[in-house]
Design a protein with these regions (language model features):
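Catalytic domains that recognize anionic headgroups
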Residues: 1-122
Length: 122
């Protein structure tokens, strides 16, 4: 399986890989896991049928796809122990704001980064 942003199944592949690794470790082992979900990165237009260019709609579709894969990952952690989850992005993305596209620029949208942390209870 591939994990790259051009694979429409990348998040499912990443979660499959992560769950497989978790299940191989003894349940009493402490685990640190970092997953960079590539589906949200461009290109993400392939998450909307017929779309040829990334935009807010395709970005939202990619986010919904990644969100749909998280329950399997969270359940694998719940089978082990209480787990601290930290979810964040490395940068935001412009989709036409002030005439800018994507994230290789200095713009407020690029610096706007979502963050959430929570405890998954066993």
């Amino acid at each position: 399986p591939t994990f790259g942003c051009t694979d429409k199944n990348s998040a499912a592949n990443q979660v499959d890989f992560a769950v497989d690794k978790l299940e191989k470790y003894p349940a009493d082992w402490k685990v640190f896991m970092y997953i960079n979900f590539s589906a949200i990165h461009y290109p993400n237009c392939h998450y909307v049928e017929g779309k040829k260019k990334d935009d807010k709609e395709s970005h939202a579709a990619a986010l919904r796809y990644v969100d749909s894969q998280l329950p399997r990952l969270f359940e694998a952690f719940r089978r082990r122990s209480d787990t601290l989850v930290i979810a964040l992005s490395d940068h935001g993305t412009c989709y036409g704001e002030d005439g800018y596209e994507y994230h290789c620029i200095s713009h407020e949208k690029v610096y706007t980064v979502p963050y959430k942390h929570f405890i998954l209870r066993k």
